[in-house]
């Protein structure tokens, strides 16, 4: 009885985690809770102590506060899930046929190129107005070079939140729009991972990379055994994480590495590929544990005063403009150029303009944008305001895309209803009934609507 109850509870948890709408709202709730806990007078001190509570691993250089453990450690679960899903998509999913996925793949690139341009442009305008110095809401001034280090903050799309908005407001949209967004966001994740590895990792001693390579090879063979030795797999995964950290590469990328090395084809008569199966099992931990707790600490930054001055801070405005305007601008421009100039084709039944509401949803940054804001700025105040910009910009993008998707969904619903009505009318017009009379005469009757003519 107890085992049945546990299975039922776990099945419920998995259903909640699988719902883009519910998991997205949970993460948003934790993000807002972090902002409140860090700024309410009676919780701010306790929250700060919790965030800075240090935990060290003996015989290593790893000694971090709880907030950094969440960012560098717990978030690895999310990146492992991303790695497994990427492997599945690259092998048998939407990215396995580059020709079919060409437009959304190119749109992902365009969506990552436009936001940094707008970010630097906005920062330049503020710098020109302030004689080269940029003053943030706290009153601290920074140079253009210092603030422009955050160019990568608005480049990433949060796939969970963007799909949650789609699930909430776009019930009648064709599946091709969701598939387009899924493909675009998957490539966006891959590009964000490369961006973190290249620009936000400081390479240390080479021998750590040798250790990472050994871990990768061992993982590759362990997960291909008929009976996977899970204890050994866990040890190898942890060692890969430690070596990534010691090598100066962001340790969450260990999750992506081992995820991509997991088989995505059925083996030994299995019904589903291991990459898909492992991703399904990890999804509840990623969606309901790793991401909400990360959001709690990522937005849990203390501001001396939450005033309107925050909304006109150069870095906040730059991040907001880059996410809300830059993302859809880059995606739509690339979609138009690739179809009208490059000769590529959209999915059947889709036009470029149909993608605009979904492109606006790609301006929802959150997870990876929060992470990049923490990595790009060494100054705590600047990093905090950048993350505030991500939070506000993402919420604005969510509202805009939600309104547009709702209107688009109603339009598609009306069009589908009209087509169905016309189709039914045509079928009625074509309905013919043959009646044989007693003398052998055949009378053809045609049914139109509810009237029968002979």
UniProtKB/Swiss-Prot annotation:
Primary location recorded for the protein, binned into one broad class: membrane
Biological processes, Gene Ontology terms: regulation of pH
Reactions the enzyme catalyzes: Na(+)(in) + 2 H(+)(out) = Na(+)(out) + 2 H(+)(in)
Pfam families: Na_H_antiport_1
InterPro entries: Na/H_antiporter_dom_sf, NhaA
Top-level taxon of the source organism: Bacteria
Transmembrane regions listed in the UniProt entry: 22-42, 64-84, 106-126, 150-170, 190-210, 228-248, 284-304, 306-326, 355-375, 386-406
Sample GO molecular function, one term: sodium:proton antiporter activity
Topology within the bilayer: Multi-pass membrane protein
Keyword Ligase among record annotations: no
Localisation per UniProt entry: Cell membrane
Function (record text): Na(+)/H(+) antiporter that extrudes sodium in exchange for external protons.
UniProt similarity note: Belongs to the NhaA Na(+)/H(+) (TC 2.A.33) antiporter family.
Alphabetical list of NCBIfam families matching this protein: NhaA
UniProt-recorded name of the protein: Na(+)/H(+) antiporter NhaA
